[in-house]
Amino acid sequence: MLIGVGTDIVQIPRIEKILHLYPELFAKKILTSQELKQFVLLGKIHHAAFLAKRFAAKEAVSKAFGVGIGQGINFKDITILNNDLGKPIVEVSSNYTNKLSPFNIHLSLADDYPVCVAFAVIESSYNVILG
């Protein structure tokens, strides 16, 4: 059963400006500890695109849940990692998922300066009603 679909587009220059003003604060606000470890290992040239993709991904996932960031789910409730082939893998904290049956989240990310886009689809093998 389809639970929801979400998409988000982020202007990378917008994230660059935020990073210039608040270099560490912004990353710590939206990234989980696992994501921060990846972020630190990147060269600074990749920081804005990395953050833009994570921001867009988390917005898209929250929209697919039908709630939006700050409306029942927060940035740190969602972790975006990559498998060995680079495919994005989404983990959602148990604080949020305890309310739901088992589900799968499919996420696609793309960036082509100056924009990045995220598209999320959430499905379940059970009938679920959100809201």
Swiss-Prot record:
The UniProt record lists the keyword Lipid metabolism: yes
Segments traversing the membrane: none
GO-annotated cellular components: cytoplasm
E.C. numbers: 2.7.8.7
Keyword DNA-binding among record annotations: no
Catalyzed reactions per annotation: apo-[ACP] + CoA = holo-[ACP] + adenosine 3',5'-bisphosphate + H(+)
Key words, A-Z: Cytoplasm, Fatty acid biosynthesis, Fatty acid metabolism, Lipid biosynthesis, Lipid metabolism, Magnesium, Metal-binding, Transferase
Subcellular location: Cytoplasm
Enzyme class: transferase
Function: Transfers the 4'-phosphopantetheine moiety from coenzyme A to a Ser of acyl-carrier-protein.
Record's protein name: Holo-[acyl-carrier-protein] synthase
Organism: Rickettsia massiliae (strain Mtu5)
